[in-house]
Amino acid sequence: MAMLLPHPHPDFLKGLLKAPFRCYRFIFHSSTHLGSGIPCAQPFNLLGLHYAKWMLLSDGLKRNLCVQTTLKDHKEGLSDKGQRFVDKLFTGLIQGQRACLAEAKTLVESTHSRKKELAQVLLQKVLLFQREQEQPNKGNPLAFRLGLSGPPGAGKSTFIEYSGKLLTERGHKLSVLAVGPSSCNSGGSLLGDKTRMTEFSRDMNAYIRPSPTRGNLGGVPRTTNEVILLCEGAGYDIILIETVGVGQSEFAVADTVDILFYYCHQLEEMNCRVSKEVYLRWQHGSNNYVCWRLDCASSKDTGRVCDALKLLRRRLAVWRPKVVRISARSWRGGHWNVGYDARILGPNTCQRGAACQTTKATESLDVEPHSGKRVRAFQESPHSPGADSCSGTKGPPWGPGPRASSRFVVEGF
């Protein structure tokens, strides 16, 4: 999508000199067929800048791509103390130090403007490190993201308590992001999920961190994607995301995870409320499970939900949502064994899902009210290098993280 900036050449050149983090070298030709006598000007790639191609017209400038700064440019704005602080967190994070992971998570969730700059540099370094780790695996994601959603009291924390211990015994490293509700008036939160996991919280191969929603109505906080990136950089291969007790419209976690477990209460019949909840989870998540406790649901209930899911359009040719009855305490139902089915769909499916997760996270992290529309316009543009990011095997190329991508699109597009 091209954008025409109606500025005369002298005024525009003066503006370029004042723009931070952008260096240009203009090449002037002798021909004057464009009317102004200065037919074209091209930027050059200095210090690793991902540059855009420019063409000077008679009274304006045509822009085909956006300018994106790299990690080195962000580092230039940091002080020596801030740079040492970021390097310390990054070194401890990739070494698996839990204290550095907790401090990095606090930094990412901060709303202070200076701390946001430090967090952005840290996230870029973690993402570059993660991409290097994924190269031997042909670019496939190394971590498995699993979401747990459902109404209050459905058994989400019980599932994490018992299945988490089993997975750590098998040699996995788990990171649990337990989301708690926040007060709209005082801003306080009740983060009691970790205290109920008495045995699992003492496991050294598990990292449990409660997080408040901070007024976000999607069931998870807005910084969920950044926190997941930090946990993956720290070496955790399974990420469990427990949402708050949700109703019928909180489905933001489906855009973040690879597979979603939705837990239901006891049902005497398949009513309209559950039909709507199952439909919403199915429409907003590719790999879904609808789970009932064995002591609550009957085979008739599961059969009715299966019949309802058959009427919905399939989003993936290799996957259909499943309905299971499980028991975390007695380990009946094999819920974790069936959960691994989503991992064997193939590397292309995993990469495509990761690309779509990053794309949707970029849309949600808007810096100003209309930035989500700008992101969609950028994605639909034929000049966008990430136009086919959700259909191919590569992730979006415009930024190292959702928040940086959103800011990049707003400022440059």
UniProtKB/Swiss-Prot annotation:
EC number: 3.6.-.-
Reaction(s) catalysed (UniProt annotation): GTP + H2O = GDP + phosphate + H(+)
Main subcellular location of this protein, as a coarse class: mitochondrion
Activity regulation summary: GTPase activity is stimulated by MMUT.
Residue positions binding GTP: G150, P151, P152, G153, A154, G155, K156, S157, T158, S327, A328, R329
GO cellular component: cytoplasm; mitochondrion
CDD domains to which the protein is assigned, alphabetical: MMAA-like
Transmembrane residue ranges: none
Protein origin, superkingdom: Eukaryota
Keyword Membrane: no
Cellular localisation: Mitochondrion; Cytoplasm
Annotated organelle transit peptide span: 1-65
Record's function text: GTPase, binds and hydrolyzes GTP. Involved in intracellular vitamin B12 metabolism, mediates the transport of cobalamin (Cbl) into mitochondria for the final steps of adenosylcobalamin (AdoCbl) synthesis. Functions as a G-protein chaperone that assists AdoCbl cofactor delivery from MMAB to the methylmalonyl-CoA mutase (MMUT). Plays a dual role as both a protectase and a reactivase for MMUT. Protects MMUT from progressive inactivation by oxidation by decreasing the rate of the formation of the oxidized inactive cofactor hydroxocobalamin (OH2Cbl).
Family: Belongs to the SIMIBI class G3E GTPase family. ArgK/MeaB subfamily.
Quaternary data: Homodimer. Interacts with MMUT (the apoenzyme form); the interaction is GTP dependent.
Protein name in the entry: Methylmalonic aciduria type A homolog, mitochondrial
